Amino acid sequence: MITEVFFRNFYRNYAKFDVVSVERREFAFQPFGGGMVRHKSFNSVDELRRYIVEKTPKHIYHSVAYYERPGEEDMDRKGWLGADLVFDIDGDHLNTEACKGSAVVSLRCLEDAKEETNKLIDILVRELDLRPTRIVFSGNRGFHIHITSEEVLKLGTKERREVVNFIKGVGFDPSRFEVKLGRRRVKLYEEEPVGSLLRVRQAVENPDTLRVEIDEVVTQDIHRLIRLPGSLNGKTGLVAMPLELKDLERGVENIVERAIAFRKGNLKFRFEKPLIGEVLFEKIEARAGDLKILPAHVAIYLELQEFGKIYD
């Protein structure tokens, strides 16, 4: 499979994995042929890289948790030591016009996901005094936020659920406020307000501004697997790329451009489905059965999205 060859070459020559405490993490891999290989452990990033080059998986994940025995298959015997606090924002879960029914990665949908990520970071920093350790473009439609500080490592599922509720504004009731907002008055919240006064006041006018659409299961699961930063997303062929805060101040086209792994060469691609639109900056107009020569990164993306097949 040509796509697998491209993946192997990337991992052998270009990949830079961004993960700490490798020896305490469980790793999991989804091969190109399907299935899932779990409970793998490695003593170093170099050992991890050698395994990845040899096996060339389609997807690569690591545990948010740290374990005494990460390679143990019995979860009760792994020896849980703590877990990062991780947030996942996915365009698929956003109820915006740009994100509804998009067959391919849409820059407009990704822009919406980026704005949701900025909103999340603002709440984490200003209201919870939690600073992201790592911000990662998922390589598809969203972003992952990792917090690895000591204060979050021992949080259990219940405490993480409370963080989720806070961020999603669960239980917020505008009728419990009484503040003068223009010509209207509402009741003042008599208990501890949800978040900052600014966020609460905005939410009185529009409750949707209070909520951040995170995947709550990801955040509260202390054994969760998350995509390895620096690896390739097997749905797109784009790099799950670590970012800096300043990257979120720019247009998402800059992020996507930097995440393109396969920049050289063209490939023949036979469409099995019709497609009209823009794919990774390339305008496409094709009917089922059409054979086109496309940039390698576009052809690989389309094959992974099951729009057709790459031909020698």
Swiss-Prot record:
GO terms for molecular function: DNA-directed RNA polymerase activity; metal ion binding. Coiled coil: none annotated. CDD domains: AE_Prim_S. GO terms for cellular component: DNA-directed RNA polymerase complex; primosome complex. InterPro entries: DNA_primase_S (IPR002755), DNA_primase_ssu_euk/arc (IPR014052), DNA_primase_ssu_PriS (IPR023639). GO terms for biological process: DNA replication, synthesis of primer. It comes from the Archaea. Keywords: DNA replication, DNA-directed RNA polymerase, Magnesium, Manganese, Metal-binding, Nucleotidyltransferase, Primosome, Transcription, Transferase. The active site is at 88, 90, 215. Heterodimer of a small subunit (PriS) and a large subunit (PriL). HAMAP family: DNA_primase_sml_arc. Belongs to the eukaryotic-type primase small subunit family. This is DNA primase small subunit PriS. It comes from Pyrobaculum arsenaticum (strain DSM 13514 / JCM 11321 / PZ6). The lineage of its organism: Archaea, Thermoproteota, Thermoprotei, Thermoproteales, Thermoproteaceae. The gene is priS.
